């Protein structure tokens, strides 16, 4: 999608601080971190949100969660714990209409989150 911020980041048109990349997904640090470790993992294919996940594209979501688990171990926060968040739609405060998962770690999280 030509006007999508995350598609432009994935395509290299907009710089990012990359954490991880493979054929299906791209992970990069958040520009306004809400925790000592805060990065986003996005599918390379443009999927608008969790609400747009289908049987045809759900394998990439499973893959993203495998990547999150791998990165949590590599970056050393798997045992302490972390939070994975996806905001959906206007009421959910989704700011970029491209499916993404925030991974937050490095501090105790509070509840309720919003």
Language-model-detected regions and their locations in the chain:
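HIT superfamily nucleotide-processing domains
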Residues: 1-114
């Amino acid at each position: 999608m030509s006007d999508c911020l995350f598609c432009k980041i994935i395509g290299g048109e907009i710089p990012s601080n990359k954490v991880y990349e493979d054929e299906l997904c791209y992970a990069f640090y958040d520009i306004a971190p809400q925790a000592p470790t805060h990065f986003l993992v996005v599918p390379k294919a443009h999927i608008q949100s969790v609400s747009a996940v289908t049987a045809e594209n759900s394998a990439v979501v499973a893959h993203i969660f495998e990547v999150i688990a791998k990165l949590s171990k590599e970056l050393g926060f798997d045992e302490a714990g972390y939070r994975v968040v996806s905001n959906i739609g206007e009421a959910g405060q989704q700011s970029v209409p491209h499916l993404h998962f925030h991974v937050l770690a490095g501090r105790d999280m509070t509840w309720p989150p919003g």
